């Protein structure tokens, strides 16, 4: 089964927690803190595998969770780092963040990789918080949470040239003649149900990749026929070969066919509709009135297109088409599928990591924030030094300033997750 789109959830591993421990050895009555650091959480990485052709692996498994980092322990022993989860995808896979619509990665060639969810950082053990005044800190830092997000995967095949045209105009026959590809060929509409790729070797030693997609019909943009879903597989192409049936045996007008296909192309993607097109009038060998071709050629050349006559079945005119397209490819610039504006930029992502929220519920000031929660869960509130550390963290996070701005008064109740206390300046 050919699967070219998938929606999955990815969750990187959390960082391990730092340890609160003290050195305990015979003859060493006051060994000091020796809690180790937490391990790094595993990240989720996507990598190109040239052996893959579809996104089938993501059809049935929708959620992926990477390993958490191990907690630190006594003796300054660090927790184990999580092992990164590497997911393989075909070349041409575009990964998009569902929440923002931004592109996280466009994986185009062998060796391309992308981290789409970073693992959390391990927390520091209590050994790091000892100083001349605080010699036995009874607290450590918790590990940070790993990133999580819903993402969409879209396979947009890597091809230099794409074939366009109505069903049954001879695209698959053309592909089979000029490449070693073996697409299904029959005399009925929608014989091709999945995209096909083939490599064209020219007589001059050049080569290029040719993509044949299922035929498009009028109304494809509204879901008629096979819809326009497969058009994504010609988005990367530099040149389009637009094949029409010039024979008229099915009673169609080749100029109308040409215009209808381009109308659907424009509805799907304005940029794609402006891609250079070479027009090929196929089935010329069974055309009874050659003046029909001359009329077609005159009309299209008047619009600025280059027009060839061809018979894919008898191979007449094929060499001329291939030579011309090969020459065009050297003159046309590569296609940048994803613009800079569409790309995700981590440095601009403020995210929710350090966001602080304070709401008043039934007279209680409810404070939430990921950073604050991590600090709170790492503190021993029965220990005065730990409590002082937490108060300083609250101050540095701007909690007290925000509470004062909201009009808090002495004796008002503040709730931070499971912790409740009365506020006093």
From Swiss-Prot:
Its EC number is 3.6.5.-. One of its GO terms (molecular function) is GTP binding. Keywords: Cytoplasm, GTP-binding, Hydrolase, Magnesium, Metal-binding, Nucleotide-binding. Residues 344-425 form the OCT domain. It comes from the Bacteria. It is an enzyme of class 3 (hydrolase). Monomer. Belongs to the TRAFAC class OBG-HflX-like GTPase superfamily. OBG GTPase family. This is GTPase Obg. It comes from Clostridioides difficile (strain 630).
């Amino acid at each position: 089964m050919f699967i070219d789109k998938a929606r999955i959830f990815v969750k990187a591993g959390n960082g391990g927690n730092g340890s609160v421990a003290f050195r305990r050895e015979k003859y060493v009555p006051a060994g000091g803190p020796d809690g180790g650091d937490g391990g790094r959480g595993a990240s989720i990485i996507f990598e190109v595998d040239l052996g893959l052709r579809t996104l089938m692996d993501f059809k049935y498994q929708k959620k992926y969770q990477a390993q958490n980092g191990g907690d630190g322990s006594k003796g300054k022993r660090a927790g184990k780092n999580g092992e990164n989860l590497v997911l393989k995808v075909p070349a041409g896979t575009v990964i998009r963040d569902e929440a923002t619509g931004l592109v996280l990665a466009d994986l185009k060639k062998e060796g391309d990789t992308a981290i789409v969810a970073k693992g959390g950082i391990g927390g520091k053990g209590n050994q790091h918080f000892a100083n001349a005044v605080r010699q036995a800190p009874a607290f450590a830092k918790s590990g940070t949470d790993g990133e999580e997000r819903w993402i969409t995967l879209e396979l947009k095949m890597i091809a230099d040239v794409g074939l366009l045209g109505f069903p049954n105009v001879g695209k698959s026959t053309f592909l089979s003649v000029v490449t070693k590809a073996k697409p299904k060929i029959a005399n009925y509409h929608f014989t091709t149900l999945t995209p096909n790729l083939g490599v064209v070797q020219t007589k001059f030693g050049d080569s290029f990749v040719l993509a044949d997609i299922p035929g498009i019909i009028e109304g494809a943009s509204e879901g008629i026929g096979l819809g326009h879903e497969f058009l994504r597989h010609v988005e990367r192409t530099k040149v389009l070969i637009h094949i029409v049936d010039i024979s008229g045996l099915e009673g169609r007008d080749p100029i109308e066919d040409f215009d209808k296909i381009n109308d659907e192309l424009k509805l799907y993607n304005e940029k794609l509709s402006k891609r250079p097109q070479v027009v090929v009038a196929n089935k010329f060998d069974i055309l009874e009135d050659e003046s029909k071709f001359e009329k077609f050629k005159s009309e299209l050349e008047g619009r600025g297109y280059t027009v060839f006559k061809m018979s894919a079945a008898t191979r007449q005119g094929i060499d001329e088409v291939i030579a011309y397209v090969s020459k065009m490819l050297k003159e046309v610039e590569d296609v940048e599928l994803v613009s800079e504006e569409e790309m995700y930029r981590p440095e601009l992502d403020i995210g929710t990591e350090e966001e602080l929220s304070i709401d008043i519920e039934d007279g209680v000031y409810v404070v939430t924030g990921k950073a604050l929660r991590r600090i709170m869960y790492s503190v021993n509130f029965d220990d005065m030094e730990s409590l002082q550390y937490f108060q300083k963290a609250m101050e540095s996070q701007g909690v007290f300033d925000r509470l004062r701005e909201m009009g808090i008064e002495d004796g008002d109740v503040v709730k931070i997750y499971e912790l409740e206390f009365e506020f006093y300046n």
